[in-house]
Regions:
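Outer-membrane beta-barrel channel domains
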Residues: 1-74, 78-308
Length: 308
């Protein structure tokens, strides 16, 4: 893994790290730094210590990737040997820059997702929509920071809604983001503008996420999203701005009763009225809230939750 792709403080010569090898046919797991079965490999406090990382550098911390695309079509128009011909030349640019050792800024112009893995085909027999996982690189980085109240089942920010309208792809004109950590505060901000099409006007998508870590495994955070539709074609009805604000709290410990896991999570989300029918609605009708106690241990586990 090239060092220039990682955010780290070059003054620190010791890193926490862990490795795991899984042998399925033997149902066997081999760990470099062991951990209790209740905790798992992804907890930083279970990592081993890798020392001797001296004189390493991120370089300039600048990455520039461009692309070019040429398309052509030749379609018979039904008049003998005559054809309708069409040609299109397109291009775009992606720029990433490490502002500090823990903060990264990115810019994308005329974004292309041609190399993105396609979704797996699924059959949905329920009345609820399927949430396909995000696979586009621009939206994948920092996804863990944007994750809101992970066990609540509430998604005030879902990146797959950007660049897609009623199953139809919408081209992205440009986008910018800042992702990283300032002290103990995790910071993520994203701004994306989509192109006007035959069925939707140009739109701006904005999202800001701040998460403060405290104690060893706990955090409190705030999330704000905004979707603004520009005025465009007269036959497309104008839409009000859609604003959402969310707060979430996560209290976790892996030392309950010495070596047990105990988790508590609470959240609240509210959005503004976006249609004439919602203007007179109460705050309760435009909000969601909930809490959850979880005791995820082996062999005994249990949970208690409330949500409305």
């Amino acid at each position: 893994i090239p060092f220039h792709t990682l955010n780290f403080d070059p003054k620190i010569s010791s890193w926490g790290i862990n490795f795991q090898r899984t042998v399925r046919r033997k149902n066997e797991e081999i760990l470099w730094s062991g951990h209790k079965r209740n905790q798992g490999i992804y907890r930083p406090q279970n990592a081993g210590l890798l020392t001797g990382l001296n004189n390493i550098s991120q370089g300039l911390g600048l990455e520039v990737v461009g692309y070019g695309k040429v398309e052509g079509s030749k379609i018979e128009n039904g008049l003998g040997k005559e054809y309708n011909k069409n040609a299109n030349i397109n291009g775009g640019l992606d720029v990433n820059y490490n502002v500090t050792s823990g903060l990264k800024a990115s810019l994308t112009l005329n974004t292309d997702f041609a190399e993105t893995e396609v979704d797996e085909r699924q059959i949905n027999l329920t009345r609820f929509p399927i949430r396909f996982p995000e696979k586009r690189d621009f939206f994948l980085e920092g996804a863990n920071i944007f994750r809101f109240a992970s066990s609540s089942g509430v998604y005030p920010y879902f990146s797959r809604k950007i660049g897609l309208q009623s199953g139809n792809p919408v081209p992205i004109l440009y986008g910018g983001r800042i992702i990283g950590k300032i002290g103990k505060i995790e910071v993520a901000a994203k701004q994306v503008k989509t192109r006007e099409t035959d069925f939707i006007n140009s739109e701006d998508f904005s999202v800001i996420r701040l998460k403060q870590n405290f104690l060893k495994e706990s955090s409190i955070g705030i999330l704000y999203t905004r979707r603004h539709t520009k005025k465009g074609k007269e036959f497309i009805p104008p839409l009000h701005d859609r604003n959402t604000l969310g707060l979430d709290l996560s209290l976790n410990t892996s030392t309950f009763l010495k070596n047990k896991n105990l988790q508590f999570q609470a959240f609240a989300v509210i959005h503004n009225p976006t249609t004439p029918g919602e203007i007179s609605s109460s705050i309760g009708d435009r909000s969601a809230r909930g809490l959850r106690f979880n005791f995820p241990n082996d062999p005994w586990s249990g949970s208690l939750s409330y949500r409305e």
